[in-house]
């Protein structure tokens, strides 16, 4: 079986965006979401740490591209993600995203 990157992104991007929307809505903290996914689902890292690793600018760019192609709200980048990118909080590469990095 061959895995195409677009298929992987079709699953991963909504997962990341859902976690970002939860933080933006005040439903849970970034720490709580990531802890729940690591402890409760045995993921190696939570969705927000993963977004920080990928780069919030990259995550936003992929989401925008997928949204423009499909017009599905599932892929619409959350306002919090766009605010962080605009503020230069791009994740690990800038030392700050959803978590601080030293």
Name each model-derived stretch:
Residues 1-7, 13-102:
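NAD(P)-dependent Rossmann-like dehydrogenase/reductase catalytic/cofactor-binding core
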């Amino acid at each position: 079986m061959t895995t195409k990157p677009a298929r992987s992104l079709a699953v991963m991007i909504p997962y990341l965006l859902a976690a970002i929307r939860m933080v933006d809505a005040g439903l849970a903290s970034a720490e709580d979401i990531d802890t729940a996914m690591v402890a409760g689902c045995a993921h190696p890292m939570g969705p927000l740490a993963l977004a920080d690793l990928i780069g919030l600018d990259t995550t936003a760019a992929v989401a925008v591209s997928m949204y423009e192609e499909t017009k599905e709200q599932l892929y619409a980048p959350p306002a919090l993600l766009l605010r962080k990118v605009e503020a230069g909080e791009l994740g690990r590469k800038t030392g700050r995203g959803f978590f601080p990095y030293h």
